[in-house]
């Protein structure tokens, strides 16, 4: 299911003295089946943008097309419930939204709310908890007895149980240790590959954006600043830094090595493995250049 923004603008508290423009002139598409990352400095419009992906917010100008559904400025949209089943959103710290007595009831809440029978919802809960790498035995336990990482996986299972076509992730690894972050990101990538899920990731982690995303959208002051593959986007390193966007650690090391040893590494290096390989290649070719004094 493709999602397209056409000249989208969003203003909070529209037509009041407190009106504030959060998005403007946003033109971007997320074709079905892809893995995308949205990056940008705090306040660049990322969170406002993703709330348009399933109608939580509606544009004050322009149109958002979600599959065959058009959400346009000035039109009161009704029956958005089916849309929110197709586009599942995992907000920051989703475990804070857990509330039921058992893990099973929490995961079943979404499917039941969409009219699924109790028996079918329980089956979806069993499938979803295995998708997020947890044992079915946890279904009978209180979610509040689990570890923080387990609680987050339960909350994600609740979204997956609704079988969305698009999975939107807003800083999904925030607050987790490095091991937990890596496990969760690998889980999302596996779901993307095995289930054909379209994934839209909002992140401040440039390593994750570079590693997983096929296309990266850079937001700045409410509009799209850059869009392209990781190689294309991070080739604009100086411009990104000027607008407050961090760079992958490998690019920072690349610069430091070039300056320290007076060598030129022409290829973009988006992981430490790539950087190591490129440094070895340059040195084998006698890539040392005399440092200017």
UniProtKB/Swiss-Prot annotation:
Keyword Translocase in record: yes
Keywords for the protein's UniProt record, in alphabetical order: ATP-binding, Cell membrane, Membrane, Nucleotide-binding, Translocase, Transport
Keyword check for Cell membrane: yes
EC class of the enzyme, as a word: translocase
EC number: 7.-.-.-
Binding site for ATP: 40-47
PROSITE patterns: ABC_TRANSPORTER_1, ABC_TRANSPORTER_2, CBIO
Self-association state and partner proteins as the record states: Forms a stable energy-coupling factor (ECF) transporter complex composed of 2 membrane-embedded substrate-binding proteins (S component), 2 ATP-binding proteins (A component) and 2 transmembrane proteins (T component).
Record NCBIfam families: ECF_ATPase_2 (TIGR04521), PRK13634.1 (NF010155)
Function: ATP-binding (A) component of a common energy-coupling factor (ECF) ABC-transporter complex. Unlike classic ABC transporters this ECF transporter provides the energy necessary to transport a number of different substrates.
Family the UniProt entry places it in: Belongs to the ABC transporter superfamily. Energy-coupling factor EcfA family.
Protein name: Energy-coupling factor transporter ATP-binding protein EcfA2
Annotated source species: Bacillus thuringiensis (strain Al Hakam)
Gene: ecfA2
